[in-house]
Curated annotation (Swiss-Prot):
Transcriptional regulator involved in extension of germ tubes into elongated hyphae and maintenance of filamentous growth. Regulates expression of UME6. Acts in a pathway that regulates maintenance of hyphal growth by repressing hyphal-to-yeast transition and allows dissemination within host epithelial tissues. Dispensable for invasion into both host oral epithelial cells and enterocytes, but required for epithelial damage. Keywords: Coiled coil, Nucleus, Transcription, Transcription regulation, Virulence. Disruption phenotype: Leads to yeast-locked cells. Residues 1-117, 203-293, 311-330, 350-542, 555-578, 614-675, 696-758, 813-887 are annotated as: Disordered. It comes from Candida albicans (strain SC5314 / ATCC MYA-2876) (Yeast). Induction: Regulated by EFG1, NRG1, and TUP1. Expression is increased with increasing cell density and during host infection. Expression is repressed by linalool. It is found in: Nucleus. It comes from the Eukaryota. This is Transcriptional regulator DEF1. Residues 1-13, 76-107, 261-270, 364-393, 641-658, 729-745, 865-887 have a biased composition (Polar residues). One of its GO terms (biological process) is filamentous growth.
Amino acid sequence: MERRQFNTSNIRNGTGRPRKTPRSKLYMVYPPLSGEDSTNPEPEEGSSQENNPTEPSSSQSNSVQNQDQSEDQSQLPQQESNTQQESNTQQESNTPSPRASNTSTETPAPLSPIQPGIRNIPSGLLLPQEKVGRLMGYPFYRDFNFTLNPERYQKLIYVFQILKNAARNHRNGASLLRKYFSLARRSKRTTDMFVTTIEEMRKRSLENSRKRELEEAQEREESNKRQHTESSAEPNAESSTESTTESNAESGAEPNAEPSAESTTESNVESGAEPNAESGAESGAEPTAESNAELKQRIWEILSYRLEQSNNETNNTGESNSTSQQPRQLPNNELIMNIRVLQKNTHAKPVLGRIKFTPDKSNKTSLTGSQNKVHSTNTQQSQKHPQQILTNSETHKPQQYSAQSQQQMVHQTNSHEPSQKRSPPPQQQQQKQPSVPTSSVPLQVSQKQNQQQQELPLPPQPQPQQRTAPSAVKQQQSMQMQPPPQQQQQQQRHQPLQQSPPTMPLQQQPVPPVQQVQTVPPPSSQPQTQLSQQQQQQQQAQLQMQVPRCYQYQNRPPSQQRQYSQTPQYNQPPPQQKVYALPPQQVYAPPPRQVYAQPTIACKQQYPQQLYEQAPQEGSSYQHHYQQVQQRQNQQPYMQSAPTYQQPHVQTPKSTRSNKQEKQRLPKGQEQVPKATRTMFEAFTGSNIAVEKLRQRTLDNGREPERLRTEYVNVLSSPERAAEKSTSRSKQSSNQKPVVKQQSSFPPPIKHQQTQEQQGNILPPVSQLLAIQSSTVTSRGSNASGAVMGSGNTQRVASRSFTNTFVAEAVVNNANNRGGPVPPTGPETNTRGGRASTRSSGRPRGNRSTQRAEGNVTGRVARSTDGSQSQNSGKASKISNIRNLLN
């Protein structure tokens, strides 16, 4: 027991997932089980468990059994939850448990009957997961997974069950198992055995499924081609395509997991009358022929490995027929499968939740004939809330409505605004709902018919918030799906197939249907309007005529819209408050709250700008707030931030040390020192702040901080001392004479030149360092270490400033990225040695990068191998300079 307590900390880390513990730790707690029969995990080995020293004492297990009866979750000790879970799987192996349905399939029945109390579990089959749980005393370790995500494997109890499930229902069954067993590995042999069996299974099933897939794919493609051509050719073919697509959808994505025998036969019967009956029969017939048991077997195999390799596979057509048999236990896998079937040859990774479920078999019309072509758009609609639709379709068979009552109902639901209060503005809704294929709202029909048709709501759309009462969904389904009694409407419903491209999203539709607004809870929950139905129809028609697109969410004519939306009086109720008593025109005036919030977002209207440009009405607290804000802004527009970000090279809190000293003590001509560096870095970064940081870094790294910096300053301030110091400190090559011009006396020649001129021998600014470095690195490489032949200062600095590679790369990259000539900057003076020289001619032997890089910063000093420095400007001198370097 002590040992067990001792290990707790290792396994548990705060997140509730175990941290991967070194295997030795696991062994400490659980030595290999003594009686284990590694080759055959199935038979019970209850006896061996008794020998296991780490098992809980018998008294403990007894207390556990008692608690098992009263499932006391709060105190659930390790064993209890374990056993309880096992018993669950036993009962539920046929009917999926809620948790199981999320992740894993039907779990095969446990290998041995389970009595409460962990002792009775065959020890060979004990999982690391359970051990860990017991080890930690972690009460619901059943939910908690060893190295896997909890969502993926929740209910796997026995090793063997895990083996079966993982191998079958998981894309990476094998690898997952390997993970499990590498942790739990009691003996290498068992693991190997498991893995090998899995791999054999995989091979076998892969071969089988490949053959089968090819056959099925061919059949299906043929039938689909036939259907497509026929449906495009003849108007009658619609209902048949409808039925066949439906059989696809049903067999593939069927929400109420009945084996597809029903659905396929049904679709066959339907399509039988139509000209292309054979095609329907073809797609349906094959699976029904075989016995269910066979099918199930086959499907499991296919599914697992199909899924496992779904990402690599190229022919993604296939077994939607066979999948339908699969019991409704792993929605995830099912979804993935069916998606792969629906999006025929796309190789994208499967996206979950993409499928359009047919909510109920009776509602045949919900899938219009265009379904096959529309797959991509339609499937997107699929379930954001599959649960809702499912429950409805299963529990209630929707009632029949006459066309009359349908219209009535729709009117009521639409005309009441209050339901919309808390809903997001419809524009946003539309972006959330992937485009609805037009085929569901027939458009190009004569005007009067239009009115009738469009007053049917769209097929139930997944709402961003689940406000729709189930009954509303039900009604809509029934309205949309039961073909209304008049034959004429039936005709209409299918016309748009020929007329309008099926995939055109709602945003582009010529006549925007009012129903986009939102599906609203059914009328029973709201006060009835006193309007007669005729009036309502008139209004609907009017709206369709007048209302520009962005007002639609409001459902009322623009005159009123304008009335409120431009003056944001937030806390005042709108002028009319008797919303429903008004004559029909005003029925749509919304309840006070929602008026303002929506229009601004949904349609861009004037008043957001007005808030800034001219003060709108006074009196509302909202307005008051805005005025205050404006005043605040006007008083101190940029004072706060300006110095930091506008010219960071002059003052930044970070760079105080170096910059302040330079600034304070430099003589008059010197203020521009930072400027040169800034231009230098702007070539690389383009932003002053970044420049400043970099510059600071180089200053701090590059110099031996205090001594060098003070020296720099002192030297600059007195030329004579400068001469002495520089001679004493640096071993100079013979031809360098430390002649330093006297700064204070005469005006600086050109800004960028002066920086280098005045510094003369002593530490060059960053730009210079960079130049030096680039030249050394990019020239032939003997120098590349960063040792520049020159005065001692610069040598040290160059090697240190920042890593050679960084500078060199920056410079070179820059150079290579933009070629082209560099504008000459003026006469070249070689201030260093005191001899002013102009050089020209010659082609560089080296790469163009150095030459280019030197061009980037206007005045930069390149240093040649003899240590002399030359001020570069024109291209010619640059070239000669490089030649100098290379010689």
